[in-house]
Amino acid sequence: VNVARLMFFAFVAMSVSSVSYAQDADCEAVAGQRAECAEEAMKAADRVLNDRYQALIDRAGSRYIFQYQSRHEEHKAFLDRLKNSQRTWIKLRDSNCRLEGFENEWDKPSYSADLNRCTAKMSLERALYLDGILPAH
């Protein structure tokens, strides 16, 4: 079971990093359209993050409702903490990305590209983190 879990996490890590690398490489290939490319990368990463967030909600439902004979209070408490954690993390991500892009803040296209690249990178990292919470048995 532990080997299977390690293999799963290794696969997810490689998937996230290869998606991130592919996005970076694609954005560099279209030098004149970096801002648009970074925006598309951010949107794709946001979809991945939303999918992983929903998957965690589904795993929590499976664990607390079905596997542990209807522990509704624990399920609700977990979902409340997850929602709070996600909201707090989004504030941190946005603040960190504004900091990373500070030097280009007055150059709108560069600043926008910096923000979107940072948001995509951090969102993919968060998606990987969410995959590790309440792993399926």
Q: What positions do the PLM features span?
A:
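N-terminal alpha-helical modules
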Residues: 21-137
